Structures are given as structure tokens and as C-alpha cells.
Amino acid sequence: MALLKVLRFPDERLRTQATPITEFNAELQTQIDDMFETMYQEKGIGLAATQVDYHKQLIVMDLQDEVERPKVFINPEIIASSGDFCNEEGCLSVPGIYAKVDRAEFVTVKALDRHGNEFTVEADDLFAICIQHEMDHLKGKLFVDYLSPLKRQRIKQKLEKAAKQDAK
């Protein structure tokens, strides 16, 4: 397994729309394993393939609870949603930044597992938030896009300043 580089906002590659996965081969299995390793190293609970410059519809998640063990979502699709929920979110691609985002409280998602088997899952609370957040990445959307242009600009400036400090 290998650690992958997580793209950071405002990297334009984060805006790339992911394409469906059609082949379930050894390369895909390695990509999934590498994404899990990267997510754990970065102390995240979810990672979309676009965040590691792999523009396919692939998400890995581990909420580290008893019910929802590590999950792989390939070509995910929300088939039902209800309720409204506002919660603070963060993102591995926008490090150190947290903001409140409105999302559906409950979602039902249809996807394929790492072997191409279809499954459906109902999610609420953190699980629902994480799924919606990661699925946004597959569409080239970030949680900061839900914020005002002024807040987005401040975040961009803060991250650019931090990147310059890290480069020194």
C-alpha cells in the first residue's frame, strides 16, 4: 500500500467531475487500499477519489463505529433524501477549516462495493453527512462552496498563506 497526496483547496483538480468505474480489477483494489491508508494517515473519516487526483466515482469511509465499518462506495447515487440538518464540517482538502453546512438529514444511497456488487444503504446523522460531503467531491464541489464568496476568499487566502509558510 502507498500513501497518496491529498489535493488541497484551491487546487483546480478538485473541481474535476469523476467518471463511473466500469472495471473491477487489481488496479482498482490497490487504489481502494491506498485511499484507506491515506485517509487513516490523515485522520479522516471519508475520502473521495478526486481528492487524491483519481477522477473516478469512488469513496472510502470509516466512521469507526460498530455499525458502519469501513465502507467502499463505487458509482454512488442518492435515491432518496429527507429532512434538513445543519452541522459543522471539515475536509482533508481544506485543512483546519470548519463551517456549518445544510444537508439532508436522511439519505438512501445505491452503490457498488469493491467487487462490483450492488448494495443500498440508509444513512442518518454523521453517516449521511459524510456520504453527501464525499459525493459532492465526485461532482467537483467542496463544502466551502456552500459558504458566502467572502468566507471562501478568506479561507483561500488563509490556506495559501499556510502553504507558503510550509514551503519555507
Swiss-Prot record:
Molecular function (GO) terms for this protein are: metal ion binding; peptide deformylase activity
Query: EC class of this enzyme?
Result: hydrolase
Tell me the cofactor note: Binds 1 Fe(2+) ion.
Positions bound to Fe cation: 91, 133, 137
Which residues does UniProt mark as catalytic? 134
**Which reaction is the catalytic activity of this chain?**
N-terminal N-formyl-L-methionyl-[peptide] + H2O = N-terminal L-methionyl-[peptide] + formate
Task: Classify the source by domain of life.
Answer: Bacteria
Alphabetized, the UniProt keywords read: Hydrolase, Iron, Metal-binding, Protein biosynthesis
Q: Which residues form the signal peptide?
A: none
Q: Which cofactor does it need?
A: Fe(2+)
**Transport listed as a keyword:** no
- Whether Iron counts among this entry's keywords is yes
Which Pfam families does this entry report, sorted A to Z? Pep_deformylase
EC id: 3.5.1.88
GO terms of biological process kind = co-translational protein modification; translation
User: What HAMAP family does this protein map onto?
Assistant: Pep_deformylase
Role: Removes the formyl group from the N-terminal Met of newly synthesized proteins. Requires at least a dipeptide for an efficient rate of reaction. N-terminal L-methionine is a prerequisite for activity but the enzyme has broad specificity at other positions.
| Similarity comment text for this entry | Belongs to the polypeptide deformylase family.
Protein name as catalogued: Peptide deformylase 1
Q: Which gene does this sequence derive from?
A: def1
